[in-house]
Amino acid sequence: MSQEFVGRWKLIHSENFEEYMKEVGVGLITRKAAANLKPTLEIKVEGDLWYSNQYSTFKNTTLSFKLGQEFDETTPDGRTVKSVVNFENGKFIHIQKKIKDSDKESIITRWLEGDKLITTLESGSVVSRREYVRE
């Protein structure tokens, strides 16, 4: 089931993304730049190792993980968090746990809805929704 996510996805719609970035502590200049991007998300799997690569004109990022195993993650804006990604009920659930007291925790959920990949990003009371289609 999770294999259906593999491929390249182009962002077509975004709601509340700048508000989400503000909630998790992303700086103003980075927020403004990132809010206007239309990145491509590439999801790959090799054995039990998953890759989530994001490409944009601003920055390219790579995240690799094994489902259910906690790992150290450096977010695109440079924050360090403890993360774990699980696959439950047809959804990838990515939990970012804060390390410093000043940081915020976040939950990123991805699922397929028709021909779209839907991503929600939640922190505190802020929820962002982003929609992607296959390239």
Swiss-Prot record:
One of its GO terms (biological process) is fatty acid transport. Belongs to the calycin superfamily. Fatty-acid binding protein (FABP) family. InterPro entries: Calycin, Fatty_acid-bd, ILBP, Lipocln_cytosolic_FA-bd_dom. It comes from Caenorhabditis elegans. CDD domains: FABP (cd00742). A fatty acid binds at residues 110, 130-132. Gene3D superfamilies: 2.40.128.20. This is Fatty acid-binding protein homolog 6. GO terms for cellular component: cytosol; nucleus. GO terms for molecular function: fatty acid binding. It comes from the Eukaryota. Keywords: Lipid-binding, Transport.
